């Protein structure tokens, strides 16, 4: 009788310990996942701000800089000068990227009142917003220049 009780208590203890370990592991994974997601969001915002700040200070946009920034920050950029897409991007962008860029532009205009297709909407200060789409982090910006406006969409 004691042997049977001993076996039952052993299995019961193992079950309780297993449940406690499972709950603790799940909680730790949840916390780690949220931290990783928040870290990725903060990194994206910092990288996007760096790119926007660089474009604010430059009068000439180098294709080498664009390619290097996209590679270093693991982002895709759509930069338009007074509504005209840069020639470099016309050669590289595939239809999927173009669809995502246009969707980001629509969300920016509809939900955040930052219309990239209306370059006259910005005065003397750069306007930028950050938001999330289903699979992407997005930043859109309108940057005033002496010759007009540079609009920018960054996807991560």
Language-model features: where?
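Juxtamembrane segments flanking the first transmembrane helix
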Residues: 1-95
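Compositionally biased, low-structure terminal segments
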Residues: 3, 45, 102, 131-132, ...
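Residue-level marker of intrinsically disordered, low-complexity segments enriched
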Residues: 14, 18-19, 29, 77, ...
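Generic detection of intrinsically disordered/low-complexity segments and helix-coil linkers/edges
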Residues: 35-38, 124-125, 130-131, 150
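Extracytoplasmic ligand-binding sensor domains of the Cache superfamily
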Residues: 64-132
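Short, hydrophobic beta-strand elements of compact beta-sandwich sensory domains
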Residues: 132-156
